[in-house]
Amino acid sequence: MFIRAPNFGRKLLLTCIVAGVMIAILVSCLQFLVAWHKHEVKYDTLITDVQKYLDTYFADLKSTTDRLQPLTLDTCQQANPELTARAAFSMNVRTFVLVKDKKTFCSSATGEMDIPLNELIPALDINKNVDMAILPGTPMVPNKPAIVIWYRNPLLKNSGVFAALNLNLTPSLFYSSRQEDYDGVALIIGNTALSTFSSRLMNVNELTDMPVRETKIAGIPLTVRLYADDWTWNDVWYAFLLGGMSGTVVGLLCYYLMSVRMRPGREIMTAIKREQFYVAYQPVVDTQALRVTGLEVLLRWRHPVAGEIPPDAFINFAESQKMIVPLTQHLFELIARDAAELEKVLPVGVKFGINIAPDHLHSESFKADIQKLLTSLPAHHFQIVLEITERDMLKEQEATQLFAWLHSVGVEIAIDDFGTGHSALIYLERFTLDYLKIDRGFINAIGTETITSPVLDAVLTLAKRLNMLTVAEGVETPEQARWLSERGVNFMQGYWISRPLPLDDFVRWLKKPYTPQW
């Protein structure tokens, strides 16, 4: 019995909650980092796309105005048809205006005009090769802001072309349908800014927020700023949700694993109390007449949730948790419970092969457990054979005394899985043993030219010299059975004869005519 302090459950719960919270925080932080990186990549892509778009757009506009520069030598009447056509086929151009001797003299929108450029657009510097300004409106469209861009004629002083451009920022320039998580874009020319988040012109000093990206368009005095939140509500919600779920899962898993680790044998004891263990019996036959002369008793665990638990898994677990003794004691009780039914169908002298772990063999209760098992079985009907496997090193002196005592009370001893590395030749020299059980690995090699085959021959020769009876495990084919019979192996078991069966199925199997084909 394992005793824990009264606050064990509270400490365990607190530990698992702390672990869950720490994992939740860690996962949330990692998710924020992932979201931040995704936004960074997204903003880089967006600003690069914007820059490429504007570079291409203004390069095309420059090419168009270069074709219009010669028209500054003509009259408005001569220039107007081409000027109007160019404006019509240039994207987002409201109007092209020709300038000569610092005066505007022809517009694609209004025709002839005679207004000094510095009066019409004071912000433009006619002496620069390229200059830009943002206007609150134009004569033809007074309520909508526009960008004006000036291109000086390189061959004619104080002459050139300027264009008034529509500002259709969001759909045309910045693909807002693809960028649902940014706040807006601002175009900055000089000290004036026009943004998607305000309908009026702004002084650049009013843009107090830090942009996530900023780029200058080559060749023109235009700066583009991209504004966005560091995190969106979706980012925050998803990070906390993922962190919360991860923390919950880790907390529950921590509680389960720590419960198992800190309460040794709890599952085994619970399974014993709830009668989840049962016995399966695998018949052992003599190799000549194929009569049932014994059976190996195997413990099985049918878990209500996990189903059948593999024997290796729960036996290794029981050994690691120091629960192999109570588990074997429970096996003895199950055998005693089935004995009355087995007595009806099995002849006198049938052998019961039972696996015993070294920990149980050397335990204080071992002799009492064996005596209790013997007295619980029908008198003089069954022969108990204890199967020993070297999972741990046996204590030689103590084992010798125990084996002598077992023989004195009528219990026989078999060495199990011989030749697999679990057992050693030294056993055969130092201990008085009755049976040698040959591992299935050797049986599977029968009929194949492997190094295992001559080893099996040597094992059989050794057993005969020591006057030990031999039992072959894992016989699955008639060829293997025939080979073993011809080599003088005494007994065999395996799926060729029968798989391990629960009590009722084993009784039904015994009552059927047994005629295996050689």
UniProtKB/Swiss-Prot annotation:
Role played: Phosphodiesterase (PDE) that catalyzes the hydrolysis of cyclic-di-GMP (c-di-GMP) to 5'-pGpG.
Alphabetical UniProt keywords: c-di-GMP, Cell inner membrane, Cell membrane, Hydrolase, Membrane, Transmembrane, Transmembrane helix
Catalytic reaction annotation: 3',3'-c-di-GMP + H2O = 5'-phosphoguanylyl(3'->5')guanosine + H(+)
GO cellular component: plasma membrane
Protein induction: Expressed at both 28 and 37 degrees Celsius during exponential growth. Repressed by RpoS.
Main location: membrane
Residue intervals of the EAL domain: 261-514
UniProt EC number: 3.1.4.52
Name this polypeptide is given: Probable cyclic di-GMP phosphodiesterase PdeN
